[in-house]
């Protein structure tokens, strides 16, 4: 599996290197050519099905296998619901539901939810990249039973205020069509899964920050010497490197 992970990581790296840049992050629109090209390449390469069972058309990899891919995506600052789709398809796969060939986003923060026939209503909070996905996967509790529900996007979207580049939305939904709804298996801890994925993303971002610091200090000169030659700068870089290493331990 290690060789397979290395190959997949190389494919992912090439796609992100080719398509993700500062222009994409600044002017990200669902109908833009740059976004559609990136999305098509990711979907067609089936990178979003890495955690899907083989009998459902996926690669059958484990969560541990995709850690380098989650880190790589964060290092590029990939501004799309790429990892969210991987996790959503994993949850669908665990419920023996075929994965989606489109971007999906997800949340487990819900309020005032109601289900009537095949429709769902409620307030769904802190949904990443909802502007770039047409479907939402939620973990929620209805009548003392936890469910995983996939439904089509609709209703009122409200962009949250945050200091990060990742756009998150609150959704006020009324009678949206349910695509799939299954009882959540007890062995699946969605909250813990999302927290761990976020931690891995944070570590990947910190690695990129460290790399940028080293590159900057190696190129910028003061008093005829690069900053990396100064003892104080070296000490600071070492401290940052230790913090990054500790975070990834």
Task: Label every model-predicted segment.
Residues 90-207, 211:
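FAD-binding core of flavoproteins
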Residues 1-82, 203:
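Amphipathic, small/basic residue-rich leader segments at the start of a protein or domain
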Residues 3, 23-34, 186-194, 211-242:
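Glycine-rich cofactor-pocket loops
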Residues 78-95:
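N-terminal glycine-rich flavin-associated loop
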Residues 10-13, 211, 242-245:
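Solvent-exposed alpha-helix faces
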Residues 16-23, 73-77, 95-96, 210, ...:
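Structural signal for hydrophobic packing residues in well-ordered secondary-structure cores
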């Amino acid at each position: 599996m290690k060789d397979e992970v290395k190959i997949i990581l190389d494919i992912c790296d090439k796609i992100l290197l080719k398509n993700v840049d500062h222009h994409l992050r600044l002017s990200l629109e669902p109908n833009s050519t740059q976004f559609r090209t990136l999305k098509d390449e990711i979907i067609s390469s089936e990178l979003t099905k890495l955690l899907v069972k083989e009998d459902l058309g996926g690669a059958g990899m484990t969560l541990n296998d995709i850690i380098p891919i989650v880190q790589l995506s964060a290092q590029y600052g990939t501004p799309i619901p790429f990892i969210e789709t991987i996790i959503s398809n994993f949850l669908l796969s665990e419920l023996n539901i075929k994965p989606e060939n489109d971007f999906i986003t997800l949340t487990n923060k819900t309020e005032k939810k109601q289900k009537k026939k095949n429709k769902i209503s409620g307030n769904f909070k802190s949904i990443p990249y909802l502007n770039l996905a047409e479907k939402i996967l939620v973990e929620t509790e209805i009548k003392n039973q936890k469910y995983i529900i996939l439904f089509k996007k609709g209703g009122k979207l409200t962009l949250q205020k945050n200091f990060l580049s990742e756009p998150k939305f609150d959704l006020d939904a009324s009678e949206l069509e349910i695509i799939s709804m299954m009882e959540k298996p007890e062995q699946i801890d969605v909250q813990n899964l999302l927290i761990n994925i976020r931690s891995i993303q944070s570590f990947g971002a910190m690695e990129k920050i460290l790399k940028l610091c080293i590159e900057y200090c190696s190129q910028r000169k003061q008093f005829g010497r690069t900053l990396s030659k100064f003892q104080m700068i070296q000490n600071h870089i070492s401290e940052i490197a230790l913090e990054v290493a500790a975070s990834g331990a």
